């Protein structure tokens, strides 16, 4: 089946780009690569320069910026934390409550070969005794 037959399908040629456009694209990539190298060198030396004067002032002030006015709404909401959580307490949580055990109908059934089908009271006592001895619990 099929062999070495190859078909030459003519594709549209995109080599009509002028030399000036090629040189411009090469120059752009060179500029981008040189900028990336400069950034990496600065990071390697451990120097990070921030051109923002506001950031520099904030760093000098120890992160305390005195230019921001106090917002009374913000302060009043923080003064009473019960207002922050009031809407959350009224909502009903639809998930499982871990204080209550799940109903047996929800639990998966064990495989039939794990447990015998019929339980005699003596079998149950023997099983509990064996489990307690395996777990080293005093009877």
UniProtKB/Swiss-Prot annotation:
Interacts with UPF1/RENT1; preferentially interacts with hyperphosphorylated form. Interacts with DCP1A. Interacts with many nuclear receptors including ESR1, ESRRA, ESRRG, NR3C1/GR, NR5A1, PGR, TR, RAR and RXR. Its main location: nucleus. GO terms for biological process: nuclear-transcribed mRNA catabolic process, nonsense-mediated decay. GO terms for cellular component: Golgi apparatus; nucleoplasm; nucleus; P-body. The interaction between PNRC2 and nuclear receptors is dependent on the SH3 binding motif. Residues 11-36, 48-59, 76-93 have a biased composition (Polar residues). The gene is PNRC2. InterPro entries: PNRC-like_rgn, PNRC1/2. Coiled coil: none annotated. This is Proline-rich nuclear receptor coactivator 2. It comes from Bos taurus.
């Amino acid at each position: 089946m099929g062999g070495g037959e190859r078909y030459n399908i003519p594709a549209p040629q995109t080599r009509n780009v002028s030399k000036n456009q090629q040189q411009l694209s090469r120059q752009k990539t060179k500029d981008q690569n040189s900028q990336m190298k400069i950034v990496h060198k600065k990071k390697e030396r451990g120097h990070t320069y921030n051109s923002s004067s506001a950031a520099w002032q904030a760093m000098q002030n120890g992160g305390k910026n005195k230019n921001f006015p106090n917002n009374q709404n913000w302060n009043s909401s923080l003064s009473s934390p019960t207002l922050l959580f009031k809407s959350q307490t009224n909502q009903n949580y639809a998930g499982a409550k871990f204080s209550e055990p799940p109903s047996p109908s929800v639990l998966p059934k064990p495989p039939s070969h794990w447990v015998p089908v019929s339980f005699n009271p003596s079998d149950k006592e023997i099983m509990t005794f064996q489990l307690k001895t395996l777990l080293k619990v005093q009877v």
